[in-house]
Amino acid sequence: GRSTWPEKNTEERIRRIEQTISTKAFQQEYMNNPLSEGEVIKEVIWGKCPPMQRLQFAVAYADPSPSNARNKASSFKADFLLGYCDGTFYVYTGFLDHVTNDEFVDWFYNLRDYASERVQVYYFIENNSLQDPFYEQVFLPMFAARARERGFIGITPDCRCKPPKFERIEGNLEPLIRQGRLVLNIDERENPHMKRLEEQFLLLNRQMKSPADGPDCIEGGVWIINQKISTLNEGSYTIGQRVRASKRF
């Protein structure tokens, strides 16, 4: 949205303010968009994550935005590192912010460094039909260039045809959160990106009056983990058509 007082609130000033107050306060005071917490998700669980060595694998899932701007009018970019252990999904750390494409690419390497050699990490990036030209024309060349500087990361595009964002988050994540089976890493509680993720969960509503790019990213990671678990379990099978990713980097 746009500020209700653009003459006073320049883009630079708005971004500086947005970084220092909550999304709820920012939307209400500067965007004339009052929000309430807990309409769908009442509480987000923080807890200790198991050592990454205990995981079969981890997934770094990224939700890009086609914007290459750091201003508040653009969508949030997101990239989070998730794992699964003993029936619970864990969000170890991640990033959620308005950033340039160059910074977004760096996030993948930051998550690689966080995981180090403790666990195999699978890297995915959302790539629906609308995003595909941008992914091929912008991100693939950027990842190729960064690979020459910092090493190769194998990234797979998630090309599935997704249901609407709210329904996916409510249907796939709300039950997990309510049952205590989706946990945010308490060691990262002061991380502003993780705080932003918690707030987006709490402000989720059917009208989508506030950003939900973070929860959308987590839903993507959980979905990928579930697909991988189903293939690892002996005798497991999947009903439906398999989607092949033909644009693996």
Could you tell me what each predicted segment is?
Residues L35-E39, R70-N71, E117-R118, L182, ...:
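Intrinsically disordered or highly flexible coil/loop and linker segments, enriched in small
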Residues A62-K77:
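An active-site-proximal beta-strand-loop segment
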Residues Q207-S210:
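C-terminal interaction surface of TIR/SEFIR-family domains
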Residues G214-D216:
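Conserved RecA-like P-loop NTPase helicase motor core
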Residues V222-F249:
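Acidic two-metal-ion nuclease catalytic site recognized across multiple nuclease folds
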Residues G1-P64:
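ATPase catalytic-site recognition across NTP-hydrolyzing enzymes
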Residues R15-R16, N33, E37, A78, ...:
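Mg2+-dependent endonuclease catalytic cores in nucleic-acid-processing enzymes, primarily RNase H-like
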